[in-house]
Amino acid sequence: MVAPVLKSFQAEVVALSKRSREAEAAFLSVYKQLIEAPDPVPSFEVARTLDDRLQRPSFDPSGQRLQDVHIAWKRCPEPPSAREQNEGTCPTGHTPANGNHLPGPEDTLVTDTLLQKNEAERQKGLQEVHITLAARLGEAEEKIKVLHSALKATQTELLELRRKYDEEAASKADEVGLIMTNLEKANQRAEAAQREVESLREQLASVNSSIRLACCSPQGPSGEKVSFALCSGPRLEAALASKDREILRLLKDAQQLRHSLQELEEVSANQIADLERQLAAKSEAIEKLQEKLEAQADYEEIKTELSILRAMKLASSTCSLPQTLAKPDDPLLVAKDVFFPTQKFLLEKPALLASPEEDPSEDDSIKGSLGTEPPYPPQLPPPPGPEDPLSPSPAQPLLGPSLGPDGPRTFSLSPFPSLAPGERLAGDSLLSKHMMGPAAFKGETGNLLAFPPTFYGGAKPPSAPAASVPCPEPTGAPEAVDGAGPEEEQLDTAEIAFQVKEQLLKHNIGQRVFGHYVLGLSQGSVSEILARPKPWRKLTVKGKEPFIKMKQFLSDEQNVLALRTIQVRQRGSITPRIRTPETGSDDAIKSILEQAKKEIESQKGGESKNSPASVSIPNGTASSSTSEDAIKNILEQARREMQAQQQALLEMESGPRGRSVPPSPPERPSPATASQNGALTCVKQEDGGGGSGSSSTVQAPLAVLSPAAFVQRIIRKVKSEIGDAGYFDHHWASDRGLLSRPYASVSPSLSSSSSYSGQPNGRAWPRGDEATIAPEDEAAMGEDEAPRVGELKAEAGAPEVGGGRLPYYPAYVPRTLKPTVPPLTPEQYELYMYREVDTLELTRQVKEKLAKNGICQRIFGEKVLGLSQGSVSDMLSRPKPWSKLTQKGREPFIRMQLWLSDQLGQGQGQAPTQQPSASQASPTEPTSSPSPPPSPTEPEKTSQEPLGLSLESSKENQQPEGRASSSLGGKPFSSSQAAGGIQEMVAMSPELDTYSITKRVKEVLTDNNLGQRLFGESILGLTQGSVSDLLSRPKPWHKLSLKGREPFVRMQLWLSDPHNVEKLRDMKKLEKKAYLKRRYGLIGTGSDSESPAAHSECPSPCLQPQELSLMQAKKPRVVLAPAEKEALRKAYQLEPYPSQQTIELLSFQLNLKTNTVINWFHNYRSRMRREMLVEGTQDDPDFDPSGGPNVLTPGHTHREPTPQSPDSETEDQKPPMKSLELQEPEGPLQRAAPDRALVKIKQEEGLEVDGDSQPQDVGDPDRGQDGPKEEHTHPLGNSDLSELAPGPFLSGTPNPDCPSLHNPQEKGTGEQVHSEPLSFKSTSESSCCSLEGPPNSPSVISSPDLTTCVSPAPSSSAPISPSLPGAPPAKVPSTSPTGDTAAALHPSTKVNPNLQRRHEKMANLNSIIYRLERAANREEVLEWEF
């Protein structure tokens, strides 16, 4: 192979060498030519010499040169021309001499000319030579260049060819080397193969030889081989014969095995066929069973309905006969057993929820009684039954229902199952308190008892009544216990935290679930508490609560198991309890229905006067498997039932009120007997038949109500009918009434329930809509003052119940408001989850953006990350590296990236930034920067109050419409101007001394006891934190941007306003009023309008344009119509943290901006939180037991838990001012129409439901919606207060500030007698006055009295509660009727966990019912809810 290649290369090399030789030869020839070419140098030299010689003659004077030339020419033959010339020049005829011709002048001339010609010719020749030489030289040079380039090209070619040759030679050499190595290997392999062949041959030979040997030597019996050669023929034959025999035997064996194999195959085939037949038969059976199951899919519903029906029947039978309640009802127990399994989870969850929220004392007591009785397992309730026949009996069903909403309570179906009613009450202060409260509340009617059990989840109705009378004393104990319980013992916080962590680890319960259901805290807070528990002595009262709850949680294994169940069921989705599944799917509706049924059953389990109605309703539901049909059946039946009941109730209300009910006097010893009896009757009707009573009020106007309102009312009525409507409804109604107003939108169902229960609450006009309705009924009732008293009592009772609700919200709302953010989309996950992120840089950017936009970490955590402030702070300060984060741990960082890039959507992207303004803006104009100077004049204050109100309410978008419009009315146009104006002022302002300004501002604020929050919100439009920062660390003027200078300009303007302090105080009052109004419905919109200071409606008139403009400097406030607010509230019920889609839908349907909707939700949530806080502080009513459970000691009247009202600050705690100013209006109003007053009061309460925004709806139908406002502005507000805080104001002891307000009767009895609506109004008015009074207004608002009215009242069953005097107000910690307890009451301001639980239950049930109605009216839903 190589040879030919080498030859070809050789040929190429030879050719190349030839070409190179040729090139060299050509080059040499060129060189030779050049060398041979004549040298131009000598010719040049000759030319030069000639030139020299020519030039010489001209310089030679001697003529020598001429002679030489002449001689030279002489030598040369003379040219003819010369001769001719010579001849011509001698015309004379002289002939030259023969030999010598001497030159003459002519000759010289001739020679000169000749010489010159010759020279010229020579020079020409020389030039030509030069030219030719130059041309030849150039050509030669060009040739040389060409030859050089050719030489170079050939050399490069040669080098290239050599290189290629070398490469190819190398490659060929490599190939040859490879071939040689392969050849060597092949040779080696061939050698190995040969060796193998040889070895194989040897083996073959050995094998052959061995075979031969084997053949030759068959084995003998001994196995010895005989050599073949030695074998004889006969032996070989014998061996062969033996082999043949062996072969035959083996063949036989093989045949037998084949036969057995065939048999086995046949048998197995038969067996397989049999099994297949059996399988087919069983699959058919399974299909049939599945069909049956599908056909009986509603079995659970039917079962639960049947259990409810049984419970209701028992309850209805037992309602009239408390004795029956005392005896365990086997059927009821059975029903409950049946009911509980289905409800187990429901119960467990509420129980958990409730238990965490209970006070330690209450928790202990309740848990002891309820929690310990395995609350969660359905079976557990029965044991309580045996212990306490009462509890198992209808009470249990009631509790069961209550369980749904309030787990723990429910579980201990009988609050004191193990103890005798008396023992238990005494033993469990809280329980007794609650149980007694309810028991007392209903003790008289017996129906009510059913209610308390529902609420108290374990109160024995029968014993409760009995106990309720003794209750007074237990109440005192409970209160004391309530106050002291937590402090009684020093807890080892480290040990408790350790045990809790152990339990959580052991049962795989997440801290989030534990915090959500047990402590009511976020995961971050729980983690902090468990990781670093502080010593008990260093904890505040609030700080001790989690440890008390943890201790109670650890006290019963059932709590842990229940929580584990919740963790398992809710793994991964803890949402606010009020969140509901989307209405879209039938499954969701079904689940809502089932939950609602269970909740209703559990809540109303035993006591419904309208049990038949409720029964029919459940049946309807069961019968129609489709959720909508079921709901509609329920609603239809409820409507029919209620209409019938309404008629009866109306008659009863007019007539029964006339009858005096003996129990009522015990309940309200102080009320006038006649009015008392009537009132009691009303109360009982409302309580015992409360459902019907309140429902009647509601129902009268059913036709007038919107579909939503109607459905809600019906559902409430159904609930009331199912359970002891009166008790339940009242409880709810009062709770709702009190809270729903404040929470106007907490849930339509809540408010509506309040509406139906409005009457018990004294808010016959439970809601705006209901209010209108209720007034009619009440108008009729109003005819009798006794009825009014009854209503008042109902209100009081309701307040008691309602009060419970307040706490409910505190416990409930926080969790409801727990940050929930929409989940990340799969695209977002994919985009960011696996992309490496620098968490340090990301958190730095987030912190910068938060700081730049003034967004607090709490809001950022809630809106963007779905985390608590603690978690956000921890994450931003110490971010883990991305690689160390789990998928869950990366989510917050993904959300941060999305937020930074504005990809989270308006809801989250904007919310955080806007929230600060909204949330920070607080009640005063958040965005409209109340002008610095705007410190409003009184009217301005009013306006500002409206501002504050509207701002605050705008936060919740619930400002009363009148106010909103008024406050806005003045400001809207000016706000834009104002914004421009303040900015111009800032731009043109001379340099200010920021330090001195802030110093003066601090001095003014401290001297006048004004809070930074109020100042910031009303004057600067900033949050308290921003104001504190500005005042403590003011930057120099030159370092501030225009925006940063604005607050200092505003401060300067405010300092220059002579009325700045008064305006701020007025604003504070207005703000408090607004807060009260919104929060507790204490001040009706009307009341605000009526009070001069409250004239938020004429804010603009009094405001100076500049102030107005300043106040509006930021943005005009958005005023929402009542319908819009209602729709937003309903949407909030369904989705407190709406998704972007929901926000857009709402904005589209309501024709609002998305920012407006977002801000409304944010503000409303903030308001809910504040209210919850206030409720928490207010949960302990200060009632004077001596005055009656409802009576607050005068001292307590103005207890000032300033913290309770968000607006109250240090300034809030001023000596109460006399609130008699309002008495005048009260008096006239009362005189004018006591009946109306009541109606209006109820209306107002109804209004409260709607919040500030819809007062008009509440008016008497006759009057028109505006009537209540106008007529009862004050009374309404006051009435609200009185209703809310009947204790303080209605208490037997007259209000010190408003002595005239109390009836002599009240004073005498020491009870708040509501016999006179006037007195009631006056009390309420007095409360209003006190509210108005700046000193007390905050305190009043937050004061337990108000609280009482607001939350304590309900809790204590407010002074008005129908509960027996002995019965401790449900809420009053010190239930002892004696005045001594009043003092005790005073100290204990803790939230009553029982009330909280009640509220939670109510909220749960309300939300479920609300969802239910939503599902029922899905077609109409779009108009009013989302």
Curated annotation (Swiss-Prot):
Disruption outcome: Knockout mice show moderately but consistently bigger brains than wild-type animals. Cell density and thickness of upper cortical layers (II-IV) are increased, while there are no differences in neuronal density in layers V and VI. Neurons in layer II-III show simpler morphologies, with a significant decrease in the dendritic length and the number of branches, as well as a severe reduction of dendritic spines density associated with synaptic defects. The working memory is impaired.
DNA-binding residues: 482-569, 828-915, 983-1070, 1113-1172
Key words, A-Z: Coiled coil, DNA-binding, Homeobox, Nucleus, Phosphoprotein, Repeat, Transcription, Transcription regulation
Residues forming coiled coils: 131-311, 587-655
Bilayer-crossing regions: none
GO terms, molecular function: DNA binding; DNA-binding transcription repressor activity, RNA polymerase II-specific; RNA polymerase II cis-regulatory region sequence-specific DNA binding; RNA polymerase II transcription regulatory region sequence-specific DNA binding
Modification Phosphoserine, positions: S81
Keyword Transcription regulation carried by entry: yes
Signal peptide positions on this chain: none
Listed GO CC annotations: nucleus
Gene3D superfamilies xrefs: Homeodomain-like, lambda repressor-like DNA-binding domains
Distribution of this protein across tissues and organs: Restricted to neural tissues. Expressed exclusively in the central and peripheral nervous systems.
Biased composition (Polar residues): 608-628, 1338-1350
Compartment(s): Nucleus
Region (Disordered): 77-104, 351-419, 460-488, 599-628, 653-676, 743-769, 904-977, 1177-1392
UniProt protein name: Homeobox protein cut-like 2
